[in-house]
């Protein structure tokens, strides 16, 4: 899967773009841009940042893909993103509401009841659920813990299809439906959806690796090829991912595949285990700062603007009010920080120079250009930062006291001593380069 830190370029893709069908182009999309009905499904077609997103509504349940359900609240987030009347500031505050990861990289669960399964099949189901847990946790920081009294957890039910809710949501129980009880990797696939992981073919950079022609897909299946723009993909596109579909999936005619490689060749899927890319993706999505083990980790914060410039405590001073600046990369403690969880999704960013001092929005400011400084931790909202995991594009940071603003390098300048400030988001999905930072663990 290689979930989602570096922008890739593809000249070959640019040459091919003019001759392929593209769901983002209204001229080549045969589905009318409105809500349509198909048998028992209502198909919602939403235009988000110039690209179409499909959601199938069936009996009041929203399907973001054939096997991914989203809550009414998540559907509302998509509608707000698609609404041209929604301001950029409002969009920037809701973008993190669509998919959330599990706190402390811990997923609580309950095992299924036997239901209509024979004793033999029921035992097989239980065994393979545990194999799926082991498969995921064996090379990641994820923990699966049997529920006691937790409010948010996952459950399993044997049904006639496979599906899972997408990501963690407060006060929600994620009911995972499983038909293929004899395949641990398929169960793992659905668990990974509950962890907040999308299908590989939905990466926004997919067009650098594959050609997708949704006009060859059966009616009502286009939601399986939605582009998820909030996450840039981690590492290279992974054809061996357990989250990847094959060329002919959902095709009207198997001789006319929906997806091919750039050279026109086809590919198959595998459901035997997680790939190296899947493990790397999980470890990025749930790290470096989402995992409990990372609380004591130390990181540098490099700007995406340049490979040799880091966030820096000016003059290595620990005096309250010391400026946070951009400076040439070094190994000094003035460029090393630890992340400590405060609220779900929010972190304090401590200086290694003095762990009682944290990155703070000056004077609790909420206006564009307000400086960021070092100050004694008082547990205020101006000292808590919401992290946006952007995969290959690094991380974005929003202060809790001003959620519509983002940590940025002032004016996008890479000169030494440039102030680090909070600024208005100028893009609704992926932040601009000056608002993206690469976290590198140094010990």
Which residues fall in each region the model found?
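Surface-exposed turn/loop modules enriched in turn-prone residues
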Residues: 319-333, 369-378, 423-428
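Sec-dependent N-terminal signal peptides
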Residues: 6-11
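Extracellular glycan-recognition/adhesion modules and their associated mucin-like linkers
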Residues: 290-318, 333-366, 381-414, 431-443
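Zinc-dependent metalloendopeptidases
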Residues: 20-293, 300
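Extracellular interaction modules
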Residues: 151, 237-238, 274-279, 330-334, ...
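C-terminal motif of bacterial Sec signal peptides marking the signal peptidase cleavage site
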Residues: 15-18
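Positively charged n-region of N-terminal signal peptides that target proteins for export
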Residues: 1-4
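Short, solvent-exposed loop/turn segments at the edges of secondary structure
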Residues: 171, 205-207, 238, 332, ...
